[in-house]
Amino acid sequence: MALFLIIEPDEDIRRLYAAVVRGLGHEAAFFDRLPIAKPDVVLVEPADSNSLAAALRLQHDNPNLPIVCASVDKPTHEEAQVLRATTYLLKPFSLVELTDALQLALSQRSN
């Protein structure tokens, strides 16, 4: 079972993401309740500067940490280079697209 850390400012969207992660048989945690254990995958809304900063701190500590970005804004070239996300999802997206992105990120984690 993997731990997915959700960094998303909208509470309703956080809950939806958590339900999808749990439906895949994994654990979901929110950044405001950061667990002691290190996450296996991060799901982040990079358009929110606080969320982006948090993801960058986590990635600094673990450069191979898979990151899935889900945003209403298409990333700039600079943002894409800085964050090195496994995948970007443009909102709105389907649950199938979200599930596929999460599974791809999970397959790319370092063990």
Residue ranges, per PLM feature:
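Two-component/phosphorelay signaling modules centered on CheY-like receiver
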Residues: 6-29
